[in-house]
Each structure stands twice: as structure tokens, then as C-alpha cells.
């Protein structure tokens, strides 16, 4: 069973507007992926396209640095914290663990489907944006739990490594 309830920033107008925007983004991501699958694309083909978009994001939206702490500061913005009820769970010189306690995209997906397998795959494929960004640093990304899988929160571990995405498919 999916638990996905925002506990903080519920009275913050800006946070609510950003969340609504992300719910809508979740709806159109669902429709795009569903359309791609219906047109004959595979999950792997969709994954690679999303990952390439993440590589672009990595090169253009984040600082070019070898310092994971500097990256974490630019990643975990105040807006992202508010939208996702997020927090930095751990930060060392080699590892950044980001925790998401509410996902507006999952809320959007649940308006279209309650298929647990599809939701889990959709979540994983959306994380290819971040995997692609990690590729640009030669770092790894591992999902240690996701809201879409029923874990109650997403735990996203980004760490310095050999560049393979330890989250895998």
C-alpha cells in the first residue's frame, strides 16, 4: 500500500503551488510513458531517453565540481525540500543521502493508475533523470526505498564511485 502524505509546509502557499505543478508533471509523465509503451517502445528505450535528459541536466543545472557537498547544496534547494517534504538524511565527503517523504508525482500517477508494478517502474524510470545527472560526475545513485514501491519514503543515495548506476533496472 502506498503512503504518500505531506506532513510539512501544508500551509505554505508557494509550496502548495509547486506541489500542484509537480502533480501535473506526474500526470503528463504518466501519459507520455503510457503512449510510448502503447506505440511499441520498451521500458529500456524510454529509460535511456530520460537518462540522457538527466545528463543534460547534470551538465547544465548543477555545478561542475568533484565536491559532493557542493553538489548537495545546489540539489537540496529550499523549494525541493518544501515540495517533497525532503531532507538531507546524511552528507559526507563521499555520499549524499536525500530523503523524500512526499512525492507529488506519485500523487499524479495515482490519479491514472493503481497498478503497483507500473507505478514502481514509472518511479524507477523517472529516477533516470538523477541517474543521468550522476553519470556526468562519475557518481552512483542507489534507490534504497521508494514511495511508489510502498516504502513510505524515498531514500536516494548518491555517492562517489566508478560511474555505474547502482540503482539498476
Where are these regions (language model features)?
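A conserved amphipathic terminal alpha-helix motif
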Residues: 121-134
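N-terminal accessory segment detector
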Residues: 1-124, 140-154, 159-169
